[in-house]
Amino acid sequence: TPAGKAAHFPWLPAASTPLPVIGVPINSTLDGMDALLAIVQMPPGIPVATVGINGALNAAILAVQMLSLGDEQLAGKLKNYKKGLAKKIVDANEKLAQVKYAFKTN
């Protein structure tokens, strides 16, 4: 559930379904901090999983992680996706290590 100016919105589905609800605070006023704080401060009994501001990708990955608990094929796809993410980080670090500067940086 994306939440910008109506950051209290995730409580509606969270209060009326036993299914997990993921709140995504969207950057609006106060750099999204108002939305983030509104989502993480849900009342007792109305849990909402919350990701970072503008964290729709992480919300999607979290949803797939939940769904993959009962689906081996989906779990395999998620594992491969995460391996790809790890490879991108390793590759980026290797490229960054090759950058040389003519002046001292530390």
Across the structure, where does each feature detected by a protein language model lie?
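A general structural motif
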Residues: P2-A3, T29-M33
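Glycine-/small-residue-rich active-site loops that bind phosphorylated ligands and cofactors
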Residues: K5, S28, G55
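Glycine-rich phosphate-binding loop
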Residues: T1-P25
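C-terminal binding/interaction regions
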Residues: D31-N106
